[in-house]
Amino acid sequence: MTPLKIGACLAPHEIADHRDWLFDASRDLELQGFSLHHDLTTEFEDRIAAAKSALDGFNGRIGMHGPYEGLDMDNKDPELRPLITARFLKALEAAERVGARQMVLHSPFTRWYAWNRLNKPSYWEEKLARIHDVMTPVVKAAETAGVTLVIENIFDVDPATRRAMVDSFESDAIALSIDTGHAHLARRMSGAPPVDYFARDAGNQLRHVHLQDLDGHADRHWAPGEGEIHWAEVFRALAECTSEPHLVLELRRKSDIPQGFAYLKGLGLVE
C-alpha cells in the first residue's frame, strides 16, 4: 500500500509553528477560525487578511471549516432557515477569498433519525426537503465559486443516509467528509459500523477526512495512536478511494501534530 500524504487543520495564527512541514511538502491544510458569529461578522476582514498572510507561499490544497454551532441545516423553523443559509453563504465567501477549494459543514443526521426513520411516514422526504431549502442556494453558490461543500459525519449511524443526501443534490459542489473519531464514537454509542466502512461506503464521493483518535467515550481529538482506532484498515479503505480526498489531522493539541504524523508514518501509512 502506497503511503498517503497528510496535512493538518490549523487556525492562521498556528500555521507558522508547522510551516516547514506543511509548506515544504505542499500538504493539505484546513483553515479553522471561520465558524463562530464574530469570525464571520465583526472580525471577518481581519480574519481574511490573517489567513492570506499566513498562506503566503503555500502551494498545497486548502480547505476551510465552515460554521456549525446552532446551524442545523435541517431546521424545522421556516423563519430560521434563511438565517442559516445566509451564514453558510458568508462562510463560503471567506472560503473563496482565501483560496479554499473545500468547505466543511456538519451533517444533520443523528441516532434519533436512524432509529425512527421508518417509524413516521415521509420522515426522510420531509427532512430532505428542509435540508434542500437551506442548502440549495449554498450549493449553487459553491458551484459558481468552485468550492466543494464536504458534509462531515457528527452523530451519523448509517453512512449511506448522508451519502443519499449528498447524491440528492446532483452536484459536484457537494460531497462527503469523514471524521474518523466521530465515526468510531458513533460505533461505541450507537452501533454504527467501523471507520473503514464509512470510508468504503463513501466511495468516490469522499473528498475530505479528519484524522483523529479517541477512546470511544468522548470526542477527544487525540493524536493517532493514543486511542482505539484501527488505523491500518482505515488507510486500506482510503487507499481504495480514487477521488484523492484531503487528509488532515484535526487534533485538540496542535503540538501533537508531529507525534500523530510520526505514529502513522511508523506504520507505513503516510508520508
Per-range role (PLM):
Residues 1-5, 14-27, 73-74, 101, ...:
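Histidine-acidic metal/acid-base catalytic patches
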Residues 43-50, 81-88, 124, 132, ...:
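Charged helix-capping and loop-helix junction motifs
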